[in-house]
Amino acid sequence: MPAAAATKAFPFDYEQVDFPNGLRLITIPTDYPNVVALYIVVQAGSRNEVEPGKSGFAHLFEHMMFRGTKEYPPEKYEAVLKAAGAASNAYTTDDHTAYHTTFSKEDFETILRMEADRFQNLHYSEDVFRTEALAVLGEYNKNAANPISKLYEVLRDTAFDRHTYKHTTMGFLKDIQDMPNQYRYSLEFFDRYYRPEYTTIIVAGDVHKEEVRRLVEKYWGAWKRGSYRPQIPEEPPQKGPREAHVPWPSPTLPWLAVAFKGPAYSDTEKDLAALDLLAFAGFAESSELYQKLVIREQKVDYLEAENPDRLDPYLFTVWARIKNVADVNYVRDQILATLDSFRKAPVPPSRLEAVKNHLRYRFALSLDSSESIAATVARYVALRRTPETINRLYDVYARITPEDVQAAAARYLTESRRTIVTLKGTER
């Protein structure tokens, strides 16, 4: 690895190719022999579900995309994967849907051709659609039996008014219940978003760039560009603190979510990076609050802060699971006091440097296989369509000062931007 590359957060040599139809290809040769990881990222997630009554369709298509084509019906698709010893799966997020497969390099052309067919020629009947829509309802009901899933759903519904981040990737229950009746709309959704200009192909592993480029051009080059652009509703400014409570119908430990409207993803501005560092400095296992609440006082058995990357402004959230319902208010006040301390004074420089070093080291350790490299790139290309955004983001981390963290806390972690949600079960 060249010395210059070794200093980058994402140190791998890669090729980025844009095809005339809008498709982007990112090829990352690695030193892991014989294995290839293929990620196909579609920049359509629950954020794109802009029509009232139509939430949940991005996630539904994570299911529908495995229902086959005329050339590769489901049983043939599975047989090809089995013969190749391939592992295939998918996931849906707010901002994108990703389909991923890992296999031996000798099967690359076979898998790439089959994937090109399902992205361009997906075919399913209304009966098949209804069956899959009902399966999604079953998945929602299963998730709804989990307290943290319900807490998360209520938090988003309470915090957001207009933006599509108001609903989770599963969608609103009433929309999921109506989903079996939306066959024609499903065809429209696929036609809008499963287009080359929304799609990035990531290939990482034992490959040659020229051969990958040739095969992608062969099987994906004729895919026709679309024209649809969603109008994502803008979230109005929050005018004051919000609260909600989720009564849980059975015994469970109480949960607490303390959230604030934060910034959108940026690999140039400092605020998002500063809040990422604050989340770790204030709430990781090495933090004073974690040591106090979890280790010494043992009032909490789970404490974490997160500042997820999203295309649009999202939520900085502190999550806590509390052992005794009588301590919920105490834990809430301790969390708020910790956040207030970041607004009032800069984080100690030594603490900030330790956090930066830990995050950089942890990221480097995570890039330990072709699959993990492709998976990481997939998360970031959904935001900026290039792996270079990783290097830019970590350059921003390196420039963050204690005063930058304090300024971001003062700007975003304020009462007027706050939403608190609690969940408490019935008494044992």
Model-derived segments and their meaning:
Residues 30-34, 195, 251-252:
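Short strand-connecting beta-turns/loops that link adjacent beta-strands
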Residues 7-40:
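Mature N-terminal segment immediately following signal peptide/propeptide cleavage
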Residues 41, 228-288, 396:
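His/Glu-based metal-binding/catalytic segments typifying zinc-dependent metallopeptidases
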Residues 42-46, 262-264, 322-324:
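Beta-strand elements of well-folded, non-transmembrane domains
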Residues 15-16, 24-30, 187-192, 240-248, ...:
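Short, surface-exposed beta-strand/loop micro-motifs that present aromatic residues
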Residues 38-102, 167-171, 283-299:
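M16/MPP (pitrilysin/insulinase) zinc-metallopeptidase core fold and M16-derived inactive scaffolds
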Residues 18, 76-228, 296-428:
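Charge-rich, well-structured scaffold segments of protease-associated domains
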